[in-house]
Amino acid sequence: MSTFKLMMDGRLVFAMAIAILSVVLSCGTCEKAKRAVRGRQDRPKEFPPPRYNYTILTRYNATALASPFINDQVKNVDLRIVTATRPCEMIALIAKTNIDSILKELAAAQKTYSARLTWFKIMPTCATPIHDVSYMKCNPKLSFAMCDERSDILWQASLITMAAETDDELGLVLAAPAHSASGLYRRVIEIDGRQIYTDFSVTIPSERCPIAFEQNFGNPDRCKTPEQYSRGEVFTRRFLGEFNFPQGEHMTWLKFWFVYDGGNLPVQFYEAQAFARPVPPDNHPGFDSVESEITQNKTDPKPGQADPKPNQPFKWPSIKHLAPRLDEVDEVIEPVTKPPKTSKSNSTFVGISVGLGIAGLVLVGVILYVCLRRKKELKKSAQNGLTRLRSTFKDVKYTQLP
């Protein structure tokens, strides 16, 4: 009997251990359970004042979410690179946009605007909304998101204690993200129907961080396909949770939890490094596209003239425009012999030589002329019987003897 009782007690203890283990696993990790209740025990000493006073209206959450997938391949999407250098690091997804120019345009028209800011985690076949908020009755003379009304601030539940908006509400701060948080994030800002896309390629080290929460962004209940977005079936209210804390208060909590877990706060958050996305080959502005554009700008031919050449499709330049023909190669490769350039010293020497030669010829001509004339005079004197002699020589006079 005692043996049976011991066996029953052992089974009971084992069953209790299994139950406790199941509860712990259902919470995820001990750190998750700790983080879920610690807010009741510890609080930050003070919170910053609200950035702007606004009213939350739930009805704005009833609008279907537009697709984050871009069908227009020509559309320019800003791509940023964010890399964590070590585990358990706090990183920021920050990128400037041309929102200011849009707001100035709206301010010039003296009209308010509505906006929507949504963050997505892009997966291979679907996209998961992780943060969504709508803004209404916005004054374009103020900074973005300073609006009189807004929707509930919706977050993916597992990100509430590890993510928050930056001070301008355009960036995203991740505290100690796990390796599973690596990948592509897309920020979509919609202002009066105009959409601004920004991609962030995030890399997290594979080393385990003890305070990080693993994420399952591929959950089919939240990760929606392009077809679901196109049919207007995605409503973030159905699978995202409310967290209507003002931005400053949420960021204060995030930093408090991060330091409480042993993290080191960065001194400052910097804008993510930009990456030049390559142009798709089908849209490369090559020779044929320029020729096509010129053809499109031509006027219609007059009656009796041949039809113009049809427009060329956008494509890479053909090989004949990239490499010369064989005869052109021969012409280019064939060496061209040019006479050597004459230096300045050689030109001077030649000039002097020519001058001396001319002077010599003139001198010889003068000598010949004098000699011929003297010879002619002597010959004339001989014919007259007179010989001309010098009459003086060193002040001594001589007289011709008989």
Curated annotation (Swiss-Prot):
Lineage: Viruses, Duplodnaviria, Heunggongvirae, Peploviricota, Herviviricetes
Virion surface side: 31-355
Region ranges (Disordered): 281-315
Top-level taxonomic group: Viruses
GO biological process: entry receptor-mediated virion attachment to host cell; symbiont entry into host cell
Coiled-coil region list: none
Described purpose of this protein according to its UniProt entry: Envelope glycoprotein that binds to host cell entry receptors, promoting the virus entry into host cells. May trigger fusion with host membrane, by recruiting the fusion machinery composed of gB and gH/gL.
Subcellular location field: Virion membrane
Family per similarity comment: Belongs to the herpesviridae glycoprotein D family.
Protein name in UniProt: Envelope glycoprotein D
Record's keyword terms, sorted: Disulfide bond, Glycoprotein, Host-virus interaction, Membrane, Signal, Transmembrane, Transmembrane helix, Viral attachment to host cell, Viral attachment to host entry receptor, Viral envelope protein, Virion, Virus entry into host cell
Keyword Glycoprotein: yes
Membrane topology: Single-pass type I membrane protein
Intravirion side, ranges: 373-402
Cystine pairings recorded for this chain: 88-209, 126-223, 138-147
Transmembrane segments: 356-372
Gene name of the encoded protein: gD
Main location, first listed in the record: virion
Record has Transmembrane as a keyword: yes
Segment forming the signal sequence: 1-30
Residues of this chain annotated as glycosylated in UniProt: 53, 61, 297, 346
Family annotation (InterPro entries): Herpes_glycop_dom, Ig-like_dom_sf
